[in-house]
Amino acid sequence: MNALKAILYYFSIVIAIIFLGLPYAYFHCYRKRDWSDYTRICCYFFPWLFPKFGIDVEVEGKENIPDKDGFVIVSNHQSFLDINVIFAAVSHTAFVAKSTLWKVPYFGWVLDRTGSIPVYRSDPKKNAGMGKKIAERTAKGYNFCVFPEGKRAGDGVMFRFQNGIF
């Protein structure tokens, strides 16, 4: 049953991308030439979707998140839902993510348009200046999420942090 639920969950996301995400991208972002809030639609969609699949999300400490200043979330990557929860809780979120994700259709396009920054695992020299890019963009109000372990830790055990931005 859990596998079927997961398939339906992701199918719902695909349908939402087609009927909400792409029109929002065109009518709001493309025409205004402003992609900074492309992820804002997620702040409404995921809180609506989670209860439909029995997903209970509790956000603690949201009062500590600045309203206007950019900030960086450093999080343990525990499950496939982490990114969805972050999108639901925090608008204008970009990610520091492995560069191979930019090759995934649509997903890579969204990462690029939202100001996300790629981490090059195969060529660490390309990562030079990443901290400066993050600092510049947070000064402009961007929010970033970093999963410093570099992969999901499904059992809750923390992996050693990768030295991409640290």
Protein language model regions, located:
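Soluble catalytic domains of membrane acyltransferases
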Residues: D56-F166
